[in-house]
Amino acid sequence: YETYSHGNLTLENMLYIPNENRIVFIDPYEENIIDSKLADYSQLLQSSNSKYEIINNLSCSINNNEILFNLPIYKGIEYFNKLLDSFLKENLSKQSYLVVKLLEISQFIRMLPFKQDIDPDKMIIFYGLASKLFNEIEK
């Protein structure tokens, strides 16, 4: 399934033009090692399921092995995530769906070295989020 892909297909890299009912993709990243629709799907999940952009801008506290933060609920993102998850389950094999979920986890793991240099608390948060996502797969 290798195809040309956006390379960084998160919700923050999309613009919706309501009067034209059109979506415009911005900030393509062509230097990815994986050029796959599965990787693009995982980046959409990074935004809609894992709420990367929201969590990345939150203040959080870390207390022993607990990560505490108030995550606001945005109905539009929740609805988008529900539609995306249904689409993936209906159109992908179980194995491909699992690959997408593992790639979603990898989106957070790959950021750990960068977050360690910039914001060590965010590194811990993303590690915790990756662990939570992995635990959900195991269930």
State what each model feature region is.
Residues 1-37:
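Active-site acidic catalytic loop and adjacent metal/ATP-binding pocket
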Residues 1-4, 16, 29, 41, ...:
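Sequence-level detector for tyrosine residue identity
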Residues 21-31, 81-95, 133-137:
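Short amphipathic alpha-helical segments and their helix-coil junctions
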Residues 21-23, 95-139:
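Regulatory N- and C-terminal appendages and interdomain linkers associated
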Residues 29-88, 105-120:
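Active-site activation/catalytic loop segments of kinase-like enzymes and analogous catalytic loops
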